[in-house]
Regions:
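Hydrophobic/aromatic-rich alpha-helical bundle segments in the mid-to-C-terminal region
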Residues: 109-114, 124-178, 182-186
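Solvent-exposed, amphipathic alpha-helical segments
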Residues: 9-16, 97, 101, 143, ...
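Generic structural signal for hydrophobic core residues of well-folded globular domains
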Residues: 52, 56, 82, 86, ...
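Helical hydrophobic small-molecule/effector-binding pocket
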Residues: 71-97, 103-112
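Hydrophobic/aromatic residues within well-ordered alpha-helical segments
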Residues: 45, 56, 90, 112-116, ...
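Basic, helix-initiating cap at the start of DNA-binding domains
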Residues: 1-32, 43-50, 62
């Protein structure tokens, strides 16, 4: 419980104040713990940032599980996975802090790029049967990351308040085309 409070406080600080504006002492104060406890759990600010950049529990497993959906329905499955994850308040808080921290911190951005490349693009590409599977996985991932930013981070209307079924119906076929449809212009 104490560790969770420390990480939550650090996520808030990194996403609001950046690397330079976050101190171990300020994180301890925000978490309501003695600064020695923060140093007990984390050897330094790098280790604290690493903990903050860990995806929500079950996130990576969910991406892998979505890949077992029959190919004809995988686009919609990936959209629903994203919507399910972001509509879980605890997961959304973690993801939002990761994205906001990565937006202005080169170290966090590099780690997020690695996570996306391995967990998202890699997991999607692994189950595709085509020579351009990594390119296709990148296209699908770009659409999903864009959806997350517009709907959940920036709350752009009308997308932010559109019923999830309508979002899945609109974006699922695009993801599906990226996964196994024609990529040439029509």
């Amino acid at each position: 419980v104490v560790l969770d409070r420390i990480v939550a406080a650090a996520r808030r600080s990194f996403s609001e104040n950046g690397w330079a504006g976050t101190s171990m002492r300020a994180v301890a104060h925000d978490a309501g713990v003695d600064p020695a406890l923060v140093h007990y759990y984390f050897s330094g600010k790098d280790a604290l940032l690493d903990a903050c950049l860990q995806p929500p529990e079950g996130f990576l497993e969910s991406i892998t599980a979505a890949q077992t959906t029959p190919m004809r329905a995988r686009g919609a499955a990936l959209v629903n996975l994203l919507l399910d994850t972001w509509e879980d308040p605890a997961a959304a808080q973690v993801l939002r802090s990761i994205l906001l921290t990565a937006a202005h911190e080169p170290v966090a951005r590099s780690r997020l790029e690695s996570l996306i490349a391995q967990a998202m693009v890699g997991a999607v590409a692994e189950r595709l049967d085509s020579d351009d599977r990594h390119y296709r996985a990148c296209l699908a991932s770009s659409q999903l990351v864009g959806l997350a930013f517009l709907r959940y981070v920036w709350c752009v209307e009308p997308l932010a308040s559109t019923a999830r079924e309508k979002v899945t119906a609109a974006i699922g076929p695009t993801i599906q085309r990226y996964l196994n449809g024609p990529l040439e212009p029509r």
